[in-house]
Amino acid sequence: MQLTSQAFSYGRPIPKKYSCQGVGISPPLSFSDIPSEAKSLALIVEDPDVPANVREDGLWIHWIVYNLSPIVSNLAEGAQIFAVQGINTAGEIGYCPPCPPDAKHRYYFYAYALDVVLPEEEGVTKEQLLEAMEGHILATAELMGTYEQD
């Protein structure tokens, strides 16, 4: 399975438009080589570079999406999501744009192909989603971009 974006390549800067300094919409994403037996897809976006004085665990969850149809190969930028979204670290449901307070941060986009459609419960946390996916992950993919405020 592969996860790519038309907006940035692995390890490269995420354009400002997708950050708190821009429009703050989600970037375009493309899923490919999805296992044929997949029943759903999930996506977790996180920043592991958060200063300890902001988050003790150093992690900020930017987006949680699950029960995406495996026939959806693309999410357009700012796309309306026809799936279930979880709660991000800001305490909101939906995409939380990159907005690092101190320096360049890395943003990891993790995609999962699952052999089930998960029970729908809006507002789940990353931990709850990972627990629900346990034993059902067929394939994974990763995309990482960076962002640093001007």
UniProtKB/Swiss-Prot annotation:
Pfam families: PBP. InterPro entries: PEBP, PEBP-like_sf, YbhB_YbcL/LppC-like. This is UPF0098 protein TC_0109. Belongs to the UPF0098 family. It comes from Chlamydia muridarum (strain MoPn / Nigg). CDD domains: PEBP_bact_arch. It comes from the Bacteria.
